[in-house]
């Protein structure tokens, strides 16, 4: 409180991490009540409902999601989660992490601890904000990905000589599709202008 910092509360106690959403919620409630005794506002409290690896505790994966929802609906504070913990020790971690991130966001997750180098995780957050109407007019999404889209089209334009007409059309390269169509027509009909 003295320095204006936020509080992060982990939903574990002397008995460890509860296996149920209700158990984690009860710990979160105690954390919030104790923090308020010290003058910390709910808006400055982040509750971590703790994600555990599905390779060891698969039954608890959805309990974390339920706990996030319970905290958001009943305690009026924010939530935080180390999303990639879910996939530790599992191949194709990216697929699990993205799916779990989307479930957590849907339950009310406010702050995701993720690998920001994993582009698909960042893309998922921007997409979620559009779909959930948090990004009004899709402004942040468009700003973030307009350049990416244009960069991809520029790269594809440079290499379109190696692509078939079907490939060019599937990639949405209108100018290249037109040019390639004219090229194909010219090569098949000497009288085509």
Q: What are these model-predicted stretches?
A:
Residues 1-43, 52-80, 84-193:
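ATP-dependent carboxylate/acyl-activation modules
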């Amino acid at each position: 409180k003295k320095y204006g910092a936020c509080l992060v509360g982990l939903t574990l106690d002397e008995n460890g991490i509860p296996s149920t959403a209700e158990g984690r919620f009860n710990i979160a409630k105690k954390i919030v009540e104790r923090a308020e005794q010290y003058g910390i506002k709910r808006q400055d409290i982040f509750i971590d409902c703790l994600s555990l690896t599905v390779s060891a505790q698969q039954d608890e994966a959805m309990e974390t999601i339920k706990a996030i929802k319970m905290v958001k609906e009943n305690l009026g504070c924010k939530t935080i989660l180390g999303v990639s913990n879910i996939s530790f020790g599992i191949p194709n971690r990216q697929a699990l992490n993205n799916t779990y991130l989307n479930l957590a966001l849907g339950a009310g997750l406010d702050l995701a601890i993720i690998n920001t180098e994993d582009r698909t995780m960042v893309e998922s957050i921007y997409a979620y904000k559009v779909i959930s109407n948090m990004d009004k007019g899709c402004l942040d999404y468009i700003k973030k990905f307009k350049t990416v889209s244009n960069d991809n089209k520029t790269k594809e334009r440079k290499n379109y000589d190696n692509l078939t007409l079907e490939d060019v059309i599937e990639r949405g390269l209108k100018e290249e599709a037109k040019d390639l169509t004219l090229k194909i027509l010219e090569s098949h009909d000497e009288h085509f202008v």
